[in-house]
């Protein structure tokens, strides 16, 4: 959902759009809540309040002030991520296809021959990091840039087995135009760029688990973050390979040698970071043209010093000359060295050229060893060729994608590698490595062990759900790690499947009830965005590969109505009730009937079941941004800090009733996941609340009326306002509560309209207008540790006779209270009060 705030209405009508006029009779929170539960995707918010916009944005719902028709058109036509702190809108808008255009935010691609393989009449446009260069297209009151690019298609092509780029591109664009937008992936880079600076500013030691290539630029500014990935392919792993021959396979129609070099250097930088936690100087031999340096510098400031007889235009310092063994002493400590020296074959005889290449490989290794043998804080990435070679068994082998699979590969060496054992590797084994192994990640750090790290802040986004990990170990880590942001795949199946297929692996699935946490927030992607200064126009889909975001050690835990709050909790219910259900009251009716309350008169205003909890359970796939467990816990300990809105404190029994209704709903829907979730939430409610039941009561609270509009044969027809199980020395406490509640009790507007047989030989009249006061009374008794109410639902009624009678219906009649009293069952009245 997106909320576009306008000062004036617009004449044009837009699809899937609704207008909301700010209600001055309600505060900003109540207006925000009402907006969040509207069912259309676009909300035009008139006479808006800035505070209401802020509330929505902090809840993860994109809400933007719009000052002109151009701004409105730009935002209503596409989805976007909004940085509400810095007032930047990141559009995810692919309408540029109508210009016969694809876009990239990687400069090196523009220097290739990719243009020869685009769709006929199409062009490639470089738009800068996250589309920053497009800012000039939008002369708006807020900063606006289009972050949509086709880099995902280009990179997927590079790693695919397909060679025809034009066909691949065409298929992917058609897929993009016919499937829902992968909004989380599109906004994830914006999120990471917002998330990690804020974490690093607060926490000295940060661990990041499972980064992939899409994060390769994000972390260049954070050398102190310790990365964990899937580990490196090292020389000793080649022992498993059988010898092969030269393959010579074409990988890409257009030249991606630049991409390969960039990946090699970035891999080396992150390897250096994990050893030394600082930025290195970057030396490169055989550097020309290295257009990708421009891309690196768009993200982070590095010093590049390069050697090559040809130009390297984006280098900090370039030496237009060859580099020799004797020049190694020019290279300083605290650096990385990338050696990419190889003579081009040209028209040279193959055998002669092969001899030169092997000599250069030995020379490259000698330079690498000499560089690493002196000084400190050094890492080298060196170009090698498939030949009989001795290499350190701990050397890291790289084979990032390049235009053709031929005979080249790379090795990363550190100062410890050069003093470890070397192993002879025959040429055929290196060919087996080149032919069968593609390095898919610039992060080659060791795997993360599922253990807590008390002094570190752990970030693990989309990294731990894989069934290679022990599910219980993942749960234990989340339960015990004091400071972290960890995601796990949500169980949004209908058969309560413990793990689900994802690509070529399986993921464990989780529900919020799998974790035992305090001071932690469990929310969705959009709920998490709101906590870190962002909001989004399209929330996560109810099915598919979605994740719970679990934030441990946050200072926002107590801010219940600001973050991961109840905004939108009824939205799915509204969509169903007002479109396909039997009546818009269907939810109210079902909740009462499923708890054996058959008096449906006024069910939409007088109900015994928490609608919040009920909707949060049965539609959890749609509204898990709302942290239900946190909401329950803070209520249970009486620490609900509320800034505004229409606040109603639920009695714990109302939450139990909601769980019972949700369980019956789940059974009817054959939804085993909701059934378990509702059972576990009910168990959690019973755990955090000390609920006791007066199922064998000894006292009751009665209400006597001036008159009853029915015939009766009991001595005094009365409404039992509740039963208690108390000792005699608690009578004073009960009376104190009744006196505090006196005004509210006598203000009850009780009415009756029919009689019925409650059970065999029990003839009663209905009583409406009681429940809201009953639950307030329940809460007061609960806080005073007085057992009040039974385990079955309280159904207000007035007993008229203990014999079978003919039921009657009358016009709704108000009943005037005469007195309210406390009486021992089968005993005497111990307290009586009148108005």
From Swiss-Prot:
* Ranges where the record places region GTase/RTPase activity: 556-692
- InterPro entries registered for this protein in UniProt: VP3_Rotav
| Name of the protein this chain belongs to | Protein VP3
Which residue intervals make up region (2'-5'-phosphodiesterase activity)?
A: 693-835
Q: What is its main location?
A: virion
| Sample GO molecular function, one term | mRNA guanylyltransferase activity
- What species is given as this protein's source? Rotavirus A (strain RVA/Human/United States/Wa/1974/G1P1A[8]) (RV-A)
The domain section of the record reads: Contains a bipartite N7-methyltransferase domain, a 2'-O-methyltransferase domain and a GTase/RTPase domain. The C-terminus contains a phosphodiesterase domain that degrades the 5'-triphosphorylated, 2'-5' linked adenylate oligomers produced by the host cell in response to IFN stimulation.
Where does this one sit in the cell? Virion
């Amino acid at each position: 959902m997106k909320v576009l705030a306008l000062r004036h209405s617009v004449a044009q009508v837009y699809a899937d759009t609704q207008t909301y006029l700010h209600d001055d009779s309600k505060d900003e929170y109540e207006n925000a809540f009402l907006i969040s539960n509207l069912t259309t995707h676009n909300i035009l918010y008139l006479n808006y309040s800035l505070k209401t916009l802020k509330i929505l944005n902090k809840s993860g719902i994109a809400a933007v002030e719009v000052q002109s028709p151009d701004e409105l058109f730009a935002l209503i036509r596409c989805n976007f991520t909004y940085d509400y702190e810095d007032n930047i809108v990141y559009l995810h808008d692919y309408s540029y296809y109508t210009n016969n255009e694809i876009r990239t935010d990687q400069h090196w691609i523009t220097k290739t021959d990719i243009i020869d393989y685009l769709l006929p009449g199409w062009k490639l446009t470089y738009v800068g990091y996250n589309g920053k260069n497009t800012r000039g297209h939008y002369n708006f009151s807020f900063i606006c840039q289009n972050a949509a690019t086709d880099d995902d298609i280009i990179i997927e092509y590079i790693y695919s087995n397909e060679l025809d780029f034009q066909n691949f591109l065409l298929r992917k664009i058609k897929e993009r135009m016919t499937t829902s937008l992968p909004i989380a992936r599109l906004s994830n880079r914006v999120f990471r760029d917002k998330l990690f600076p804020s974490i690093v500013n607060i926490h000295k030691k940060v661990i990041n688990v499972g980064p992939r290539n899409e994060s390769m630029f994000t972390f260049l500014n954070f050398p102190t973050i310790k990365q964990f990935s899937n580990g490196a392919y090292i020389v000793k792993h080649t022992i498993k390979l059988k010898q092969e021959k030269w393959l010579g396979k074409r990988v890409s129609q257009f030249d991606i040698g630049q991409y390969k070099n960039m990946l090699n250097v970035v891999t080396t930088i992150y390897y250096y970071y994990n050893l030394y936690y600082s930025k290195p100087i970057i030396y490169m031999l055989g550097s020309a043209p290295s257009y990708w340096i421009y891309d690196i510098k768009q993200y982070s400031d590095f010093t590049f010093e390069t050697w090559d007889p040809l130009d390297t235009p984006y280098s900090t310092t370039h030496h237009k000359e060859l580099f020799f063994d004797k020049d190694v002493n020019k290279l300083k400590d605290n650096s990385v060295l990338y050696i990419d020296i190889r003579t081009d074959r040209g028209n040279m005889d193959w055998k002669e050229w092969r001899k030169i290449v092997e000599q250069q490989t030995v020379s490259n290794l000698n330079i690498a060893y000499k560089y690493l043998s002196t000084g400190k804080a050094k890492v080298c990435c060196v170009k090698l060729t498939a030949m009989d070679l001795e290499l350190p068994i701990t050397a890291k082998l790289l084979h990032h994608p390049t235009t053709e699979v031929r005979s080249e590969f790379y090795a990363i060496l550190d100062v410890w590698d050069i003093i470890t054992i070397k192993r002879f590797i025959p040429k055929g084994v290196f060919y087996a490595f080149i032919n069968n192994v593609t390095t898919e990640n610039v992060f080659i750090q060791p795997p993360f062990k599922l253990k807590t790290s008390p002094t570190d802040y752990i970030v693990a986004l989309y990294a731990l759900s894989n069934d290679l990990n022990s599910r219980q170990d993942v749960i234990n880590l989340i339960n015990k790690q004091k400071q972290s942001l960890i995601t796990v795949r949500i169980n949004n199946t209908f058969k309560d499947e413990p793990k689900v297929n994802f690509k070529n692996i399986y993921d464990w699935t989780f529900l919020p009830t799998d974790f035992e946490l305090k001071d932690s927030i469990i929310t969705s992607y959009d709920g998490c965005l709101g906590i870190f200064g962002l909001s989004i126009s399209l929330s996560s889909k109810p099915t598919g590969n979605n994740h719970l975001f679990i934030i441990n050690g946050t200072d926002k835990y107590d801010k219940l109505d600001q973050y991961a709050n109840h905004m939108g909790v009824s939205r799915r219910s509204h969509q169903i009730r007002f479109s396909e259900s039997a009546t818009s009251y269907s939810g109210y009716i079902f909740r009462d009937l499923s708890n054996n309350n058959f008096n449906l008169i006024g069910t939409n205003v007088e109900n015994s079941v928490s609608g919040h909890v009920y909707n949060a359970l049965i539609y959890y796939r749609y509204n898990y941004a709302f942290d239900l467990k946190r909401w329950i816990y803070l209520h249970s300990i009486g620490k609900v800090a509320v800034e505004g809105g229409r606040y109603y404190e639920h009695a714990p029994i109302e939450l139990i009733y909601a769980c019972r209704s949700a369980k019956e709903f789940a059974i009817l829907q054959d939804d085993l996941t909701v059934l378990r979730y509702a059972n576990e939430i009910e168990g959690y409610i019973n755990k955090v609340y000390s609920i006791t039941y007066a199922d064998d009561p000894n006292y009751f609270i009665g209400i006597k009326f001036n008159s009853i509009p029915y015939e009766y044969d009991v001595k005094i027809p009365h409404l039992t306002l509740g039963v208690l199980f108390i000792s005699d020395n608690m009578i004073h406490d009960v009376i104190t509560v009744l006196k505090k509640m006196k005004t509210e009790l006598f203000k009850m507007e009780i009415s009756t309209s029919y009689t019925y047989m409650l059970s065999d030989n029990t003839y009663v009249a209905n009583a409406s207008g009681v429940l809201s006061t009953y639950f307030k009374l329940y809460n007061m008794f609960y806080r005073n540790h007085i057992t009040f109410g039974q385990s079955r639902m309280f159904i207000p009624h007035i007993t008229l006779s203990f014999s079978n009678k003919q039921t009657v219906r009358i016009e709704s009649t108000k009943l005037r209270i005469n007195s309210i009293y406390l009486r021992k069952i089968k005993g005497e009245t111990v307290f009586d009060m009148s108005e």
